[in-house]
Curated annotation (Swiss-Prot):
Function in brief: IGPS catalyzes the conversion of PRFAR and glutamine to IGP, AICAR and glutamate. The HisH subunit catalyzes the hydrolysis of glutamine to glutamate and ammonia as part of the synthesis of IGP and AICAR. The resulting ammonia molecule is channeled to the active site of HisF.
Catalytic reaction annotation: 5-[(5-phospho-1-deoxy-D-ribulos-1-ylimino)methylamino]-1-(5-phospho-beta-D-ribosyl)imidazole-4-carboxamide + L-glutamine = D-erythro-1-(imidazol-4-yl)glycerol 3-phosphate + 5-amino-1-(5-phospho-beta-D-ribosyl)imidazole-4-carboxamide + L-glutamate + H(+); L-glutamine + H2O = L-glutamate + NH4(+)
The organism's place on the tree of life at top rank: Bacteria
Protein name: Imidazole glycerol phosphate synthase subunit HisH
Record-annotated Glutamine amidotransferase type-1 domain positions: 1-194
EC assignment: 4.3.2.10, 3.5.1.2
Assembly with partners or alone: Heterodimer of HisH and HisF.
Listed GO biological process terms: L-histidine biosynthetic process
Gene3D superfamilies: 3.40.50.880
Record GO cellular component, one term: cytoplasm
Active site: 77, 169, 171
Length: 198
């Protein structure tokens, strides 16, 4: 069973449909026990970082999200950004799973970064065009598995142990996006040969 955390922000139904299309059972939940007992946990999100952290804290979910060690935990779009220490969007602390901060995209191109862009990675699955919608980004680090170029390098997939962050929307990225989501559900992409920043 896959638990998709429903904390009041985000495209939870679209993510649920994508996961079910891949053949998995998926529930929408904000219940501690259901999250703890799931095989995989997904933290989606669309909206403002500060609002999302407030909603997570009001539901008492920060502790369970940050304490999981035995299963994949996947953050999508804003959900990925919540994994970081701090965000300039609202000047608020995140879940502090990944070191580093969420910062405004510094690009000569229009912001938000909206539409299709290609992934750059050493992983053979991560060389496709995928769909982005965001105005903030993570900093480049050793945890980046794939990135995209938009006048600057933007982390697109990050992984630290069992935590996987996906900045783009795999559920809106066609068959390639679904294949990437499926690999994340199976545990992700990280090994010594696939880190994009090496």
């Amino acid at each position: 069973m896959i638990a998709i955390i429903d904390y009041g922000l985000g495209n939870v139904k679209n993510v649920q449909r994508a996961v079910q299309y891949l053949g998995y059972d998926a529930i929408l939940t904000d219940k501690y026990n259901e999250i703890a007992n799931a095989d995989v946990v997904i933290l989606p999100g669309v909206g403002h970082f500060k609002d999302a952290m407030q909603a997570i804290n009001e539901r008492g979910l920060a502790n369970i999200i940050t304490s999981i060690t035995d299963k994949p935990v996947i953050g999508i779009c804003l959900g990925m950004q919540l994994f970081y220490r701090w965000s300039a969007e609202g000047d608020v602390e995140g879940l502090n799973i990944f070191p580093g901060n969420i910062i405004p995209i510094q690009s000569p191109y229009p912001v938000p970064h909206l539409g299709w862009n290609n992934l750059i990675s050493k992983h053979p699955l991560l060389l496709h065009d995928v769909y982005f919608v965001h105005a903030y980004q993570a900093e480049m680090s050793q945890h980046v598995v794939a990135y995209t170029e938009y006048g600057t390098k933007i982390p697109a997939i990050v992984q630290y142990q069992n935590y996987i962050g996906i900045q783009f929307h795999p559920e809106k990225s066609g068959d390639d996006g679904l294949a990437i989501l499926n690999q994340a559900l199976k545990g992700g992409f990280q090994d010594d040969q696939t880190m994009a920043s090496n």
